[in-house]
Amino acid sequence: VLAALFVVASILFAGCFSDSGPPGYYGTIIVPRAQEFRWSDGGLPQTFDPAFAAAPPDTDAVRALFEGLTDYDPVTLAAVPGVATRWESSPDARVWTFYLREDAKWSNGENVTAADFVRSWQRTLKIGPLAPHTDLLSNIEGSGGNPPPPKTEKQSKPIPIFGAEALSDHVLRVRLHQSDAAFPALVAHPVFRPVKVLDANTTNRLEPDHLVSNGAFQLSGKEGDRVLLERAKTYWDGASVSLQRVSFIGSSDAEDALAAYRTGDVDAVTNAAFEPLALKLLAGYRDFRRSTFGALTYYSFNASRAPFDDVRVRQALAIAIDRERVSQDHLGGATEPAGKFFPDEMSGEKPVVNEDELIEQDIERARALLSDAGFPDGAGFPTIRLLINRNDQQRIVAQAIAAMWRSVLGINTEVVIKNWDEYELAVKAGDYDVVRRGMVMQTTDELTNLRMLFERETVPVIANSIPSLAKPGEVVKPEAPVVTTENEALKELRAVPIYFASSFALVKPYVNGFGGNVLDAPSLKRTRINTGWTERQP
């Protein structure tokens, strides 16, 4: 087997030490003379519709073609102006007002208006579950089909049912069910980007042949295994966009993408499923990049049944896990151990969880907690039923953690493996003691991420921090900082973070501004080809 792996490696890396490129870089470097970016992004975009885009490369194409109220700074992930030049909120952060720029245009020359956003969001809600990220709109009043508030005698007209309202062509007001101080960051997500539709009931996918967009780029066509974008002439900030052309280049698999990069046919490779051996061999190259990706694997306890209703038991099981060993030894170093629920990069300006609050292995304390809970050395503790979906990686992780619980606490574990449909039914029925869950964070908005991580019915601490849905006009006290809620969640440990995924990329040294981040969302608006790049000798 090892011999076969090295044969594969020799094929993958053939020619990488040739004189065609500077030392330390993978493969050939041919500096382009034009502002064209050739991107192998895990395949070709299958949709250009913000409502239907689920993941890269679709979401990357949508971010290039459409602009929302805000965008992310690709480095800090702070919300920066997009179509909106500024925004303000009510004191309780439940009502947000966005002021749109007057020079924002669609690619057909028409003005982008606040009504475009209202219609687009209503359309996404109308599409429903077929739109993969509809749930991100759930905090907007009226998004869940709530009945309209009764009309009072003092009101000249009823309060609009839907919480997004165009006060004028260039002023948009959004009412939320609950306070969200980071709402401007949430609306940077592709699902909030407007589309040119005349009717909010239009649920068909946007057709590429007649696509009208408002972003820095517009769709120019498809040539063989390439989807082509060109800089939009109508974009309000076109002068700051360097790239004239972007080519999404298809590849059959990671080896195909790697071969194209090695020969200089593409400028960047992202979202390729590299094998562990390939990752180890690539790690030494200067153009290889690795970053933490906001995809969390965690274990959730069924705290409605004994003995998992005892926080001491949950804490003991949590700190008996050696996350570093799981990531390094069992997953080949391709993941990052998670001592909390959100990566550091999500915290931004806010305080982060203190070092002493991180979940780390502590064998002696784990044993003491289990003994205090009435199970010294695991005596009398029932066999844990650990439910996972059928997946080789998750099986390896589950078996490793089960072995740690056995060696540290003397507790036996039955790993229950089910196909996805059966797994989901078991989760809904609560037919488990511990269950493997996963979440890909779509935003830096921690309130939204907490809503995705925890269900009110199963996590009282989180439930107490999320008020019941308020009616329009009701006064709601401002929320406590979300990081406090994360701290409380770490104390209660109804769920236990295990590891974050990592994202990997190869980027030619002459490509500037194409940086990775925890959302795996690089900005093509900031990307530039340094046509005069040369290798500087040390």
Feature-to-residue mapping (PLM):
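A structural "hinge/loop" feature
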Residues: 28, 41-62, 83, 110, ...
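Extracytoplasmic/peripheral linker and loop segments enriched in polar/acidic and small residues
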Residues: 30, 165, 327, 359-360, ...
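N-terminal lobe/hinge region of extracytoplasmic solute-binding protein
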Residues: 39-91, 122, 210-213
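Aromatic- and charge-enriched surface segment that lines or borders ligand/interaction sites
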Residues: 85-136, 173, 260, 307
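Gly/Pro-rich hinge or "lid" segments in bacterial periplasmic/extracellular proteins
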Residues: 147-159, 165, 169-171, 176-245, ...
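Extracellular/periplasmic solute-recognition and catalytic clefts
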Residues: 220-228, 247-305, 328
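Ligand/substrate-recognition segments at binding pockets and active sites
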Residues: 224, 371-441, 503
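Structural transition elements
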Residues: 336-373, 390-396
